Amino acid sequence: MIEYVIPKKLKIEEERSETEYYYARYVLSPMEKGYGTTIGNALRRVLLSSIPSVAIVGIRFIKPEKYHEFDTLPGVKEDILEIILNLKRIQLRADVPVRERVKMTVEKRGPGNLTAADIKVPAGFEIANPSLKIATLDEEADLFFELYAQAGKGFVPAQEMDDHPEIGWIPIDGVFSPVMKVNFRVESARVEKRTDYDKMILEIWTKKTIFPNEALKRAVDILMNHLQIITDSLPEGMPPLTTEFVPISQEEVKVEQTVSEEEAVYSKKIDELELTIRSLNCLRRDKIETIGDLLKRTEEDLLKIKNFGPKSLDEVKQKLLEKFGLSLKKGG
């Protein structure tokens, strides 16, 4: 009979809460060779792309009236594009089911700072980072605008927000994922005399709207639901497996060496993103040649590149998520 070595349980090595995020580190070991990468990559992709949340997807300026993001507001230091970039960093939590778009309002006079705490949200909603600065106002500033939020998953570019609920609506990229970053690496582990088993270390950073444990549980549920469909679709009465799964505890495992899949991804050329020629040339002119070079830049850094506008930024973000499950730093 063939034996498969599997872990007895997932070990939570570290959990902590920071001002802007939650963090947790997990260890799953030992596993048969290759399973660390298989499981780690699957979890990472689902965590970054498929955990639902609520995000701001549009804005409408009522006082003063403005109709596009390339404009300015009297008495406000930041232009509308900068304000929108800050709005995308708001961490919005909903304790009630969200089936339709939700309207929120902001009314503020200067002087002073406009922060996320100034947003009036409906019952059942909460802003997890109320101290986030959105704009700087002087004595001339007198603002009244509406924000629209909806439920979703992953990243939805502004140009795909086709349903404009009000005249003057300016769409905003839907940054729905509550998971900010996921890393995993695979180390070689020894069980008795064999040294070719896998030990998978998984790190998760989430917004303050969800705990890493909850996000991980949801990701596992999503994967299991898909795999269960395959199992349920196969004919019954198949011959039993001539294998045995042998659980081994973490204490029986010795770590030998580290092999980081993340390093391999970071060394890939940006050509693998399959960007348009315009976006690709803009990045290369700014000496961005690899995925690692790209991830060192924030969204604001990229927008400073000549001829690299919001549409190019949306394209890069979408391709990073689709191809590698990665996301850019927000900056600030």
From Swiss-Prot:
GO terms for cellular component: cytoplasm; DNA-directed RNA polymerase complex. The keyword Transcription applies. It catalyses: RNA(n) + a ribonucleoside 5'-triphosphate = RNA(n+1) + diphosphate. Pfam families: RNA_pol_A_bac, RNA_pol_A_CTD, RNA_pol_L. One of its GO terms (molecular function) is DNA-directed RNA polymerase activity. Residues 1-234 are annotated as: Alpha N-terminal domain (alpha-NTD). One of its GO terms (biological process) is DNA-templated transcription. Keywords: DNA-directed RNA polymerase, Nucleotidyltransferase, Transcription, Transferase. Transmembrane segments: none annotated. Residues 264-332 are annotated as: Alpha C-terminal domain (alpha-CTD). InterPro entries: DNA-dir_RNA_pol_insert (IPR011262), DNA-dir_RNA_pol_RpoA/D/Rpb3 (IPR011263), DNA-dir_RpoA (IPR011773), RBP11-like (IPR036603), RNAP_asu_C (IPR011260), RNApol_insert_sf (IPR036643). Its EC number is 2.7.7.6. The N-terminal domain is essential for RNAP assembly and basal transcription, whereas the C-terminal domain is involved in interaction with transcriptional regulators and with upstream promoter elements. HAMAP family: RNApol_bact_RpoA (MF_00059). Belongs to the RNA polymerase alpha chain family. Homodimer. The RNAP catalytic core consists of 2 alpha, 1 beta, 1 beta' and 1 omega subunit. When a sigma factor is associated with the core the holoenzyme is formed, which can initiate transcription. DNA-dependent RNA polymerase catalyzes the transcription of DNA into RNA using the four ribonucleoside triphosphates as substrates. This is DNA-directed RNA polymerase subunit alpha.
